[in-house]
Amino acid sequence: MLDCIVIGAGQAGLAVGYYLRKKGLDFVILDAESGPGAAWRHTWPSLTLFSNSASSNLPGWPMPHHEGFPPASHVIDYFARYEQRYELPIRRPVKVDKVDHDGACFHVFAGTEQLTARTVVAATGTWSAPFIPYY
């Protein structure tokens, strides 16, 4: 049984993974995407962060400098390097179908696979069904 299963490898999931790793806990991060970058993999080309790189850090390691507001490609690269730097145990692509709790532990179902853990963190974000405006 794992200490924790984190569902989602975006900003929140990576930050949780950092602290779980720091505490030496046994965990896995399940991510539905085929690679790093979370929702940034699906944005329109002109989308940027609304803050500069110095204000967009994940715990433990600052985002590399970028003049102005970083574009999606910069964020995706940062996420990928962050995952590698902290050797986060991310499995992709894994789509979680269901999470149950039996009173003692959580059961996470993904396709034909079932994992168990003492805790689950839902870090799926809000971009599972993004609204992209039409102009």
For each feature predicted by the language model, list its residue ranges.
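FAD-binding core/adjacent interface of flavoenzyme oxidoreductases
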Residues: M1-L2, R85-Y135
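Short amphipathic alpha-helical segments
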Residues: G17-Y19, R41-H42, A129-Y135
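Conserved Rossmann-like nucleotide-cofactor binding loop
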Residues: A12, G35, W127
